[in-house]
């Protein structure tokens, strides 16, 4: 569900207010996905806003609106290739600003290594993911962390072996050829993740 802020009355033609999502039976919403962050950063840049924390503040408003409507939040964080040297600062800001004043008991963190997502890119390795997951747990007081950087059949068992990873965010099941989400492949990924 999209958790547009700005109230719950009026025309929201291309947005879905949090209360509308809750009324439809949604229990969770995804906030801060790298694509959403890029969109917001692009709009802010067009408006001349250069404050890098602005996106995190906007997402914080969405988190609070979602929680006020009774939704739980899957909050995405991640660093781009040019941010890897400062990953602790980038991810720390996304967490501290984005979750400021939020009920953390109703939040799960999805980690997206943005620099490694997509066809032809080198996936993040186990030591890197372990380091990030440990950092996120330390920064958030132990919130659940799921991996959102391409959980697929060929890395499901490896990701399941990481003690600080509590699950995965699966948007696609096939990353080459006919890219898409295929239910039978989704079930196979789950089977492999669970070790069955």
Predicted regions mapped to residue ranges:
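C-terminal helical cap(s) of enzyme catalytic domains, especially alpha/beta-barrels
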Residues: 45-48, 52, 174-196
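Glycine/small-residue-rich loop that forms an oxyanion/phosphate-binding "nest" at active or ligand-binding sites
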Residues: 2-57
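Hydrophobic faces of well-ordered beta-strands that scaffold small-molecule active sites
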Residues: 1-2, 29-31, 73-75, 107-111, ...
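Glycine-rich phosphate-binding active-site loops on the catalytic face of alpha/beta enzymes
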Residues: 30-39, 79, 103-106, 113, ...
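Catalytic cores of alpha/beta
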Residues: 150-165
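Active-site beta-loop-alpha junctions enriched in small/polar residues
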Residues: 1-6, 34, 78-82, 114-116, ...
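Conserved anion-binding
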Residues: 37-121
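Glycine/Thr-rich beta-alpha phosphate-binding loop at enzyme active sites
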Residues: 7-14, 113-144, 151, 179-181, ...
């Amino acid at each position: 569900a999209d958790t547009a802020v700005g109230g719950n009355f009026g025309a929201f033609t291309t947005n879905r207010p949090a209360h509308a999502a809750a009324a439809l039976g949604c229990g969770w919403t995804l906030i801060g996905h790298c694509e959403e962050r890029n969109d917001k950063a692009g709009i802010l840049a067009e408006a001349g806003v250069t404050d890098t924390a602005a996106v995190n503040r906007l997402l914080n408003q969405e988190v609070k609106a979602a929680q006020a409507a009774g939704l739980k939040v899957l909050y995405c964080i991640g660093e781009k290739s040019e941010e890897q040297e400062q990953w602790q600062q980038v991810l720390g800001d996304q967490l501290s600003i984005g979750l400021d004043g939020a009920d953390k008991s109703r939040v799960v963190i999805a980690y997206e290594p943005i620099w490694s997502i997509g066809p032809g890119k080198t996936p993040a390795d186990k030591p890197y993911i372990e380091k990030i997951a440990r950092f996120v747990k330390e920064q958030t007081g132990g919130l659940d962390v799921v991996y959102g950087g391409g959980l697929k059949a060929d890395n499901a068992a490896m990701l399941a072996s990481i003690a600080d990873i509590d699950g995965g965010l699966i948007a696609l099941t096939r990353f080459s050829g006919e890219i898409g989400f295929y239910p039978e492949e989704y079930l196979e990924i789950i089977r492999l993740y669970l070790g069955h």
